[in-house]
Amino acid sequence: TTTHFVPSMLAAFVASLTPENAACCKTLKQVFCSGEALPTGLCREWEQLTRAPLHNLYGPTEAAVDVSWYPAFGPELAAVEGNSVPIGFPVWNTGLRILDAMMRPVPFGVAGDLYLTGIQLAQGYLGRPDLTASRFIADPFAPGERMYRTGDVARWLDNGAVEYLGRSDDQLKIRGQRIELGEIDRAMLSLPDVAQ
């Protein structure tokens, strides 16, 4: 049996488990989490209660959803030092690039902007050529190819995994929905009775 949670739903599920009723999870062979940062403490609690392998997945809709993975159990989980599990390693046919403001690769451990490459990238945003042009850009390392600017800030870890550090813009998520604060600001300011 396999199941897939967003981390907040996994947290609610784990909160309902006790050592006695956790036996209901014994048939789980794999558990996947995606959609939000996956807290390290939650993974450790899950592992202690169930022993079912937990995998962290990462990826935006603009790139066929899941573009990286990280095993959130066993020795890999034990080695995690941060508050959330790394977003991990690229899946097949996917590239992860972490670049500085000059579009140069950053060294291990240095924060930069996360870009995605590969055949799974969307063509762009329907009816939004301006947004498409700003997010889907030419890949300076692969002539004729494109890459997607995620807006996520990340860094390379010593083991080659990628760690998510936050956002470089004012986007946030509420209940899994992307909220662009700049769009709300512009819409409010366009109203006749609103001033800043």
Residue ranges and their predicted role:
Residues T2-H4, V14-P86, G95, P105:
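Gly/Ser/Thr-rich phosphate-binding loop
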Residues V6-P7, I184:
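Conserved glycosyltransferase catalytic-site signature
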Residues S8, A63, Q177-I179:
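Conserved catalytic/ATP-binding subdomain
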Residues M9-A12, S134:
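The DHp (HisKA) dimerization/phosphotransfer helix of two-component histidine kinases
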Residues M9-L10, L38, L121:
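Alpha-helix capping/helix-boundary segments
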Residues A11, R44, R186:
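Active-site phosphate/pyrophosphate- and oxyanion-stabilizing loops and adjacent acidic/basic residues
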Residues A52-N56, P71-Q196:
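AMP-dependent adenylate-forming
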